[in-house]
A protein has these predicted regions:
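Short hydrophobic/aromatic beta-strand or adjacent loop that forms the aromatic wall/cage
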Residues: 130, 237-239, 382-387
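Charged phosphate-binding loop/patch that engages nucleotide di/tri-phosphates or the phosphate backbone
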Residues: 369-374, 378-392
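Active-site beta-strand termini and strand-to-loop segments that position acidic
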Residues: 133-138, 242-245, 389-392
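A residue-level signal for beta-strand positions that form part of recognition/binding surfaces
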Residues: 210, 269, 384
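Short, well-ordered beta-strand micro-motif
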Residues: 70-72, 143, 241-243, 386-390
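Acyl-donor binding region in acyl/amide transferases
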Residues: 215, 236, 244, 250-375
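Nucleic-acid endo/exonuclease domains
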Residues: 1-226, 230-237, 276-314, 335-341, ...
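A generic structural signal for short, non-catalytic loop/turn and secondary-structure boundary residues
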Residues: 46, 206-208, 247, 265, ...
């Protein structure tokens, strides 16, 4: 049969029946992916305005994931090491030392928005637990979570600690958001924009009816997400933008269901990966207009999406007629070894990859046991909310 002939041809060339099992093909695919990642990320405005890159594209392509590379700060000329795999822009450790007043800085920012009263270190809401900041008029609470003191080892914060506080606040009709230390340190402008949006005090307002929809290329999408979304770039295949006077104001991206989240690909079923607007800007009706365009032009039968429970209560999805399907369990990030002020996603530290990333690797230990042995800690989030939209 044709299938047998195909398998034989692949076996003759690569020594395996399935081409995806070939180490040669895997290496080519990885290098191609890293080449595209380099091209998209290292040309973003957010990176180019802050650092000089002191390595070549070839060096990046040949190295393994989560390898540290050298950068030079454009402000103070400090040279430092950082990795790119998490999609964050490398940040100079000299210019961005986080003061012990993390919570005070957030407090001062909120007060500058003329939001009052703002109470500090409140124990009367979910006693005996403490809330860092409470905006009683807005029914909004804010936690400023330093990585060290909110880690599982150093801070003795268990898997459900942050989620539990969120749920206790919800029972009181209070929305709780958690700001992780590295978000405030590295993406302060985006965090401030999110807080403004939650408090409905954005600087600029435009209306979707005055905007036109365009398909957006990878470079433009990457640049916009890196500058305006806390989670940064994505691997979406469909990118839709709202333009006003030729300026990109909002972006919504879609793609296949992600297997890493336990999903299997289903025909005509898509995941909404990202939605964001330009910093400090409210685009009234933007999400609805982009979603309707996607449905009209791509004919999905179902769309799913996930809301980060640290930041979102899912109100955007319910306004778009999504139905909440489930509550996801908390996820964790690693931090500590050589970089105690930055989180690294667990996907980059699966046990089968650890032998090349840590000094002391024991195949008889679990991933977490190996990381602990090497002086890493981890911090848990609040999980995610899964939403679904069925299209008739």
């Amino acid at each position: 049969s044709d299938q047998v002939k195909k398998e034989n041809a692949v076996f003759d060339k690569y020594g395996v029946k399935n081409i995806q099992q070939s180490e040669e093909v895997k290496n080519k695919t990885t290098k191609s992916r890293r080449s595209k990642f380099y091209d998209s990320l290292l040309t973003t405005d957010r990176l180019r305005s802050k650092v000089d890159v002191l390595f070549t594209k070839e060096e990046y392509i040949e190295c393994g994931y989560y390898t540290s590379f050298k950068f030079r700060c454009k402000t103070c000329s400090t040279e430092f090491l950082d990795c790119l795999e998490d999609g964050d822009v490398p940040v100079c450790p000299t210019c961005n030392k986080l003061s012990s007043t993390f919570q005070t800085e957030v407090y001062d920012f909120i007060v500058s928005l003329n939001i009052t009263p703002v109470e500090k270190n409140v124990r009367t809401i979910i006693n005996p637990l403490e809330i860092d900041l409470y905006l009683s008029e807005k029914k909004l609470a804010i936690e400023c979570n330093g990585l060290y003191w909110h880690g599982e080892i150093n801070g003795n914060k268990s898997r459900n600690y942050h989620l539990n506080k969120t749920q206790l606040c919800e029972k009181k009709g209070i929305r709780l958001i958690h700001i992780f230390e590295d978000e405030w340190r590295f993406k302060k402008d985006i965090v401030k924009s999110r807080i403004r949006s939650i408090l409905s005090v954005t600087t600029n307002t435009t209306f979707a009816r005055k905007c036109e929809i365009r398909e957006v290329d990878v470079k433009t999408s990457t640049n916009f997400l890196m500058c305006n979304h806390l989670q940064g770039k994505d691997n979406s295949s469909i990118k839709l933008g709202l333009y006003c006077n030729n300026e990109l104001m909002s972006l919504m991206t879609f793609g296949k269901l992600r297997t890493a989240l336990g999903n299997t690909s289903v025909p005509n079923t898509y995941e909404m990966y990202r939605f964001c607007s330009k910093l400090n800007t409210s685009v009234v009706g933007g999400a609805s207009k982009l979603l309707k365009y996607f449905i009209r032009n791509y004919h999905p039968s179902k769309i799913i999406s996930y809301a980060d429970r640290r930041w979102s209560n899912g109100n955007l999805y319910t306004s778009l007629n999504f139905i909440k399907k489930s509550n996801g369990s908390p996820n964790y990030w690693y931090f500590g070894k050589g970089n105690s002020y930055k989180r690294y996603h667990r996907y980059g530290y699966a046990k089968h990859t650890l032998s090349d990333k840590i000094e002391l690797f024991d195949p008889n230990l679990t991933e977490w046991e190996n990381m602990r042995t090497n002086k890493w800690d981890r911090i848990w989030d609040c999980g995610s909310l899964k939403f679904e939209l069925f299209i008739k």
